[in-house]
Amino acid sequence: MAVCTVNGQKEREVHILATNDMHANIDAFPQLAAIADSLRERYPSLLIFSAGDNRTGNPANDMFRISSYPMVALMNEVGFDATALGNHEFDVNSLPPLMRYSGFSYICANIFPSKEAGLHIVPTKVFDVDGLKVGVIGVVQVNAQGRPDTHPDNVKGIRFALPKNIVAQYEEFSRQCDATILLSHIGYQDDIEMAETYPWLDLIIGGHTHTQLTEDEPLHNGVLITQNKNKLPKVTHITLTIKKGKVVGKKAEYIDVKSFPVKSRMVEVMVDYFSNNPMFKRVVGYAETPFKTKDELNYLMCEAFLHEGQADISIVNNGGVRLDSLAVGDITMQDVLSMDPFYNEAVEMHLTGEEILKILTTYSRGSLYHLPRVAGAVCEVTVDKNDEHKDRLKSIRLKTPDGQEFDIHKTYKVVTNSYMQSACKSYVSDPGHSLNIQTSVMLTNYLESLGVIKCKGMQYMKVTEE
């Protein structure tokens, strides 16, 4: 592990610009670059960090010749110093070449790639800020299957360890540094647990759960935690005050990106170049009514699977749709590929009603947010009325669309995506087979067959509190 020397007697400041879960929102980069430039004018030694999930969510980035190269080029131009690995960094097998183009470091302590994986990752890095030693440790979330939330084929040859267990190994590293930062892609609640367990951390720059924090966020066991919503609505300017080798002051300022009055002209030119693909402008349908929420778009995807796959039931994981809303008007390939950027294939499975319920129960992990969405059946769920977020599931039942009892012994033709197939195939009887069509193509075909669509709302889910 790298070693840092304790430095200095008088108070000095380290300034950091932090992002998380940018999800390829390259349109925000002209203002992000201007924010970075304005801070760098005042603080020439400014550090710029990302907490991961830089890619996935914009076809101009995700479908570029080298997938996600636009984000890397723009991050280089802004002057990023390092990024954590997010689970979506593994969505497409373009990470090794991207690392060769990156002018910043990839930091992750709980990943152990084989030599064949071709990944150039460091567990920690020490940044020299005018003689102050700022140590950074990186971590990525690991699910119950022992990997980040991505298709298992994307992480072959890579072993992961639980973040909490790994961070414990770096306490001595922190003692040698003037400031210690955890660049974390594990989620807000897990960041709080990290702070409670490891008070020697000075700062956690968080991501993964898209939690919008504010200047009023209290310190957690003395540790400052920051995070923003996804797609760059805000960035965080962090000031660490250091005296005698210890952090004696911590402050976070959240800056609104969209309303920032200045744009970088150079970055605007780069964004225009990356976005100039006529394919994205092709119209595939018309939305007669708006789709106001991601859940309404989840059910549009479910309907596409149901009808195009000629299925009895369709299942879509809640994270399978990446667009938050859709306005009235033309629906373009840009919209389709923003909704479904994952290159998943449509998969057919033959499952009993009991197995379908098991998928919903197991995958949801007791959370309404994580509950997969279905079409062809109505999912009746009860949430705990005492839960502040109304997310804790108490029960899940399925009914037929006309309100009859769902036959759990009957075998149904189910169409889902290859990510869901990989997540559930270990506890169902039929591993399924590919329909040899990408889910984005299936969605496109469905929209083109309808021509005009209307939002049907939440017709396949009923939520009650108890």
Question: What do these predicted ranges mean?
Answer:
Residues 9-13, 19, 41, 169, ...:
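Catalytic centers of hydrolytic enzymes
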